[in-house]
């Protein structure tokens, strides 16, 4: 049985040159995807993508760079087969058609959770990319994140994202594009819209008052445990609303873990 492929497409209302730059210029990549990029995107070279706020990094081999239409990268996750990411861009009137294929996933139940998590990640990332290009192209950002293991099933976590008290007042999350309005635990009013919804694994909220994004995620560890996380960033980090939201992440996550029954065995919130 062959390896499985994840696909994601999106029409982005920006010219191909801008979308290509967002995938290949390290400064622009750091504006929406990895927080830091080391290396050159040249065929045969290797690049490292770093998420410093999460303590994560991956190394990728550059397989093909066909400016401004096609980019192919390959990486080998620990203990798993190699995976290949292909990004293709095409003119679509006054916009760009983005097509992503990410292959090399184990078929069937063996790779089901990794496929689902990666698919959720690409749905979120592509919508964040569109938001970045529409409002903040070329701007740098400041990121903060918090992670915690929790003794809860994946499907039990997402409903609590909307529960008052853990992060803010009541946070009603609708479909992609729907407006949001809530108050932080400190009482500050925030407004924005849902950028991406890939529940129960991820949700991304564009926050107008912070000039940034809040991503909530849950990663299944086993049938009774998960890793929950919150990541916030801003392209205008001097805004007081961003500083307040970023400072609230760790205590807010501790409250969420407590509401779910406590940390998973071997971890602490």
Give residue ranges: language-model regions.
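Actinobacteria-biased recognition of intrinsically disordered, low-complexity terminal regions
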Residues: 1-7, 13, 261-269
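Short beta-edge strand/loop motif at the mouth of beta-sheet-based domains
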Residues: 7, 14-18, 24-70, 142-145, ...
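Short, conserved charged micro-motifs
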Residues: 18-20, 153-159, 239-244
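Signature tryptophan residues that serve as conserved aromatic anchors
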Residues: 20-23, 32, 75, 122, ...
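Beta-strand/loop substructures that line and gate deep hydrophobic ligand-binding cavities in soluble
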Residues: 70-120, 195-258, 267
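Surface-exposed beta-loop interaction hotspot
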Residues: 106-159
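Short amphipathic alpha-helical signal-transduction/dimerization elements
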Residues: 123-134, 250-264
């Amino acid at each position: 049985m062959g390896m499985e492929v994840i696909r994601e497409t999106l029409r982005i209302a920006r010219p191909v040159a801008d979308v290509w730059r967002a995938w290949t210029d390290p400064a622009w990549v750091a504006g929406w995807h990895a927080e830091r990029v080391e290396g050159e995107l040249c065929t045969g070279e290797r690049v490292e993508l770093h998420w410093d706020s999460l303590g994560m990094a991956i190394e990728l081999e550059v397989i093909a760079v066909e400016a401004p239409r096609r980019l192919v990268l390959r990486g080998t996750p620990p203990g798993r087969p190699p995976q290949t990411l292909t990004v293709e861009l095409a003119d679509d009137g006054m916009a760009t058609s983005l097509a992503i294929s990410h292959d090399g996933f184990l078929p069937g139940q063996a790779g089901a959770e990794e496929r689902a998590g990666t698919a959720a990640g690409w749905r979120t990332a592509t919508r964040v990319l569109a938001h970045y290009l529409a409002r903040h192209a070329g701007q740098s950002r400041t990121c903060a994140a918090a992670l915690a293991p929790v003794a809860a099933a994946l499907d039990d976590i997402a409903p609590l994202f909307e529960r008052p008290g853990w992060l803010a007042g009541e946070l009603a999350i609708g479909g992609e594009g729907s407006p949001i309005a809530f108050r932080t635990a400190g009482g500050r009013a925030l407004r924005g819209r849902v950028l991406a919804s890939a529940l129960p694994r991820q949700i991304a909220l564009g926050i107008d008052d912070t000039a940034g994004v809040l991503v909530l995620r849950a990663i299944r560890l086993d049938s009774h445990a998960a890793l929950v996380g919150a990541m916030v960033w801003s392209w205008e980090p001097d805004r007081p609303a961003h500083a307040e939201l970023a400072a609230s992440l760790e205590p807010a996550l501790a409250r969420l873990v407590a509401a779910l029954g406590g940390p998973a065995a071997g971890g602490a919130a």
